[in-house]
């Protein structure tokens, strides 16, 4: 298969695409891939590191207020469409996949206008602006949350899940030991993190809850975010940190460690939810209030309704609420087991295979 992929700006658009490519290369080793991203997006670092060819173009989003910048946005979009058409004609993809971000708008629009099979993948429960725009032009739509289905006008909408789910599910036999992080094997473990940058409100709640965490029969690994580690350690100065608590800047090799986690505290981003449901990890979700259309709350609610997670809204988060919910999970194995089963029931551990099937359907329909 010759696959062109476009998605960028944030990891939530990039990592699912890379997970899909990784799986496609496993089942079809001769697959050729061209990734098209934005000049200033995270993809400029992540995609080349993964070993794939990357082409970039300049794009930007619309301002909500009247602004001359919106004139520039239209100009850049039209310029990007022209660039994308040239790339498509040169690369000759069998299918083009968009995973969100402004750059995918130009690339998928160009592909549709050239009559190339097109598929978009929506990771969240609230459909992004770019995918809403593209829905009327593309051949197939793939979703990771059932709530997204009604937001698309097309009949050809397929639930696939998020490819990151399969990538994580394939690593369940990792030989990781908690001793590598200064903790013990065989002790129930809860992991707490607020994303790669960390989340100040989550960090503050953990600092407040630390005296209680120190006394628990379970152990805690807490990632502050690289940029916030010094601040957190400063706030903890003079406080004893129990042998059952490990504070780190960042969780390295997350896919290898997640299968060994008994519970998780995290934001409610699409990638995180895909990972925890693929593995069936009981989770306390703290949705970020700083995202478009409050989509993390909707993501979290989808799991809470299924008994697959607990949720604490950020304005209700403090040390007391955090330790109360953590103890509810960690000190009752039956509660954890039930939530783990519910979580796994809504997961998609074969998400990449499902999305590959959608790509192949788009190609086959085009050839009829």
UniProtKB/Swiss-Prot annotation:
GO terms for biological process: carbohydrate metabolic process; cell division; cell wall organization; lipid glycosylation; peptidoglycan biosynthetic process; regulation of cell shape. Its main location: membrane. Belongs to the glycosyltransferase 28 family. MurG subfamily. It is an enzyme of class 2 (transferase). It is a peripheral membrane protein. It comes from the Bacteria. Pathway: Cell wall biogenesis; peptidoglycan biosynthesis. UDP-N-acetyl-alpha-D-glucosamine binds at residues 10-12, 124, 196, 251, 296. InterPro entries: GlcNAc_MurG (IPR006009), Glyco_trans_28_C (IPR007235), GlycoTrans_28_N (IPR004276). One of its GO terms (molecular function) is undecaprenyldiphospho-muramoylpentapeptide beta-N-acetylglucosaminyltransferase activity. It is found in: Cell membrane. Cell wall formation. Catalyzes the transfer of a GlcNAc subunit on undecaprenyl-pyrophosphoryl-MurNAc-pentapeptide (lipid intermediate I) to form undecaprenyl-pyrophosphoryl-MurNAc-(pentapeptide)GlcNAc (lipid intermediate II). Its EC number is 2.4.1.227. HAMAP family: MurG (MF_00033). PANTHER family: GLYCOSYLTRANSFERASE (PTHR21015:SF22), UDP-N-ACETYLGLUCOSAMINE--N-ACETYLMURAMYL-(PENTAPEPTIDE) PYROPHOSPHORYL-UNDECAPRENOL N-ACETYLGLUCOSAMINE TRANSFERASE 1 (PTHR21015). Keywords: Cell cycle, Cell division, Cell membrane, Cell shape, Cell wall biogenesis/degradation, Glycosyltransferase, Membrane, Peptidoglycan synthesis, Transferase. It catalyses: Mur2Ac(oyl-L-Ala-gamma-D-Glu-L-Lys-D-Ala-D-Ala)-di-trans,octa-cis-undecaprenyl diphosphate + UDP-N-acetyl-alpha-D-glucosamine = beta-D-GlcNAc-(1->4)-Mur2Ac(oyl-L-Ala-gamma-D-Glu-L-Lys-D-Ala-D-Ala)-di-trans,octa-cis-undecaprenyl diphosphate + UDP + H(+). One of its GO terms (cellular component) is plasma membrane. The gene is murG. This is UDP-N-acetylglucosamine--N-acetylmuramyl-(pentapeptide) pyrophosphoryl-undecaprenol N-acetylglucosamine transferase.
